[in-house]
């Protein structure tokens, strides 16, 4: 069978082959440590950024450990467990619905309780980032969470991957000289 992006993302992030659908797990559903997790353990700041949703297969493979890529809510719950410093993308696909289609508490207060500052749009990021220890940057309220708009469809104030990347580098280099790891998917 042809490799899907969750298996490919897991291979990129961990160096291990796995089954289609797996996020950060091997064929036996055991957790695989990603290069991003190793960087964090070594004292580096870590960021995961994407032009799609933050809980999508490739970015998730760097911070999450779930047996199925469709477990968007559960993948999002793995984000604060990883404890990385910066996450950014279009948004989150299922912020209040579990994989078994049950209503659940919104992920955003969970992120905030874990010490993350959530910024919706670049202007909000600029006003909040200086005081933030950990940051999540997503599209403005009401924007499509699945991906950033293509250039031809972009409106004033829409995030771009270039803005996300610049913001990530700026955030990850403030107050630290231990280096950083940044995954950018576009």
Language-model features and meaning:
Residues 123-186:
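Anion-binding catalytic surfaces of enzymes that hydrolyze or transfer phosphate/sulfate esters
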